[in-house]
């Protein structure tokens, strides 16, 4: 049964419809899990349990679970093939006709499996998705591509939920959540291959992980292939040691076992918890100090905020004054430019006239000379009139000050005005003039005294220097 050779000449039907028979020239290899029967049978073969139709010579007793056999048969659901398909859709290396899947998916493979998987061609998943990639089956030595439960397109073998693994290694067992190990656990942990599997939520760990995705970098050597393993955790988290999760669980258990009540004192707590509470208290005190510091600076900040409108008003006023000054400067610059242009034109005219005068035999037009000098005469007349007006204004101001200070007894107009005024007003005016005259005379005398004192101080300074030089 488990690999024993049979020598009978009459082949019997396999458990699932495989044809078996004795060989006259070669010994059969017997019943095995994946062994290939290469012997030739000459006797007739009988039908299988599920109606398989053996035809022709077969190599020997086929495997019970879909191992490769060199015989022609049909599958349980009407697929016509020259080679038999396994129970779960493993495909031998023989040419077969197209068979339909369980849910009607069309396949171009050689034979159809129980769930409609197509071998050596484009295969469809449970819900009709196409798979076009090939991997090597380690049990039957053939190329096939299997689809995930939800139709994901893997590059190699896929998991129950269709996660894609891109390894080019031989096909391996898949974890329930899409991890691709050589030998996988319930949650997709790798046992001994180099394929990195994703976690439940798509995280990529760097090593073997625990139930909640704790990743470690420890290398586990498998006795069969000695390949580094890597798999994803449930939540995709990473850790450097495999023992961290048990340590966290132990810590939580220890905390839950502590007899902590609302009446427990801090001194009665464990050192680690007491240290955490002290650090938290220090942090709170630090934040309180910062709040007090900010509260102390609130007045200054409010004053600065209140000063912003005043600063803005001052800047606006300064900007307006600066704009006016710039406009005035622009006007003056424009006037300077016009004067410079006029002087330049006059200079050019004078240069032409001078060149004509210096050139012998040239005739000079009197009109040009007359025009030039007439223009200059009018300009100088305007300037003289301006000077005379300014001088007359100065003279009037000086005479008024002199009259107010010292009076004008020889002036008949002042006498008439004084006669018209009353006696009290005349006395007040006289006192005012006398007071102003006294102030002026006092200032003059003070100036004279200051000059005299300065002269005497200079003389004393000179004598002091002379005495100092003699004493040395």
UniProtKB/Swiss-Prot annotation:
Its membrane topology, per UniProt?
Answer: Peripheral membrane protein
What are the UniProt keywords, alphabetically? Coiled coil, Membrane, mRNA transport, Nuclear pore complex, Nucleus, Protein transport, Repeat, Translocation, Transport
Q: Where is this region: Disordered?
A: 28-104, 211-242
Residue ranges of SLFG repeats: 113-116, 159-162, 185-188, 210-213
Which segments carry the FG repeats?
2-3, 33-34, 65-66, 77-78
The GO terms this record gives for MF are: identical protein binding; molecular condensate scaffold activity; nuclear localization sequence binding; RNA binding; structural constituent of nuclear pore
Mapped GLFG repeat ranges: 14-17, 48-51, 86-89, 101-104, 125-128, 148-151, 175-178, 199-202, 233-236
Question: Which GO cellular component does the record give, naming just one?
Answer: nuclear envelope
Q: What is its main location?
A: nucleus
Question: Where does the record say this protein resides?
Answer: Nucleus, Nuclear pore complex; Nucleus membrane
Which one GO biological process term can you cite for this protein?
telomere tethering at nuclear periphery
User: What segments bear the compositional bias annotation Low complexity?
Assistant: 64-80, 214-226
Under the heading Pfam families, the entry gives:
Nucleoporin_FG (PF13634)
Highest taxon of the source?
Eukaryota
Q: Note what the entry says on domains.
A: Contains FG repeats. FG repeats are interaction sites for karyopherins (importins, exportins) and form probably an affinity gradient, guiding the transport proteins unidirectionally with their cargo through the NPC. FG repeat regions are highly flexible and lack ordered secondary structure. The overall conservation of FG repeats regarding exact sequence, spacing, and repeat unit length is limited.
- Subunit details: Component of the nuclear pore complex (NPC). NPC constitutes the exclusive means of nucleocytoplasmic transport. NPCs allow the passive diffusion of ions and small molecules and the active, nuclear transport receptor-mediated bidirectional transport of macromolecules such as proteins, RNAs, ribonucleoparticles (RNPs), and ribosomal subunits across the nuclear envelope. Due to its 8-fold rotational symmetry, all subunits are present with 8 copies or multiples thereof. NUP49 is part of the NUP57 subcomplex (NIC96, NSP1, NUP49, NUP57) interacting with NUP57.
State the remark under miscellaneous: Present with 4760 molecules/cell in log phase SD medium.
Q: What does this protein do?
A: Functions as a component of the nuclear pore complex (NPC). NPC components, collectively referred to as nucleoporins (NUPs), can play the role of both NPC structural components and of docking or interaction partners for transiently associated nuclear transport factors. Active directional transport is assured by both, a Phe-Gly (FG) repeat affinity gradient for these transport factors across the NPC and a transport cofactor concentration gradient across the nuclear envelope (GSP1 and GSP2 GTPases associated predominantly with GTP in the nucleus, with GDP in the cytoplasm).
Q: Which family does it belong to?
A: Belongs to the nucleoporin GLFG family.
The record's section on PANTHER family has: NUCLEOPORIN P58/P45 NUCLEOPORIN-LIKE PROTEIN 1, NUCLEOPORIN P58_P45
Q: What is this protein called?
A: Nucleoporin NUP49/NSP49
Report the source organism. Answer: Saccharomyces cerevisiae (strain ATCC 204508 / S288c)
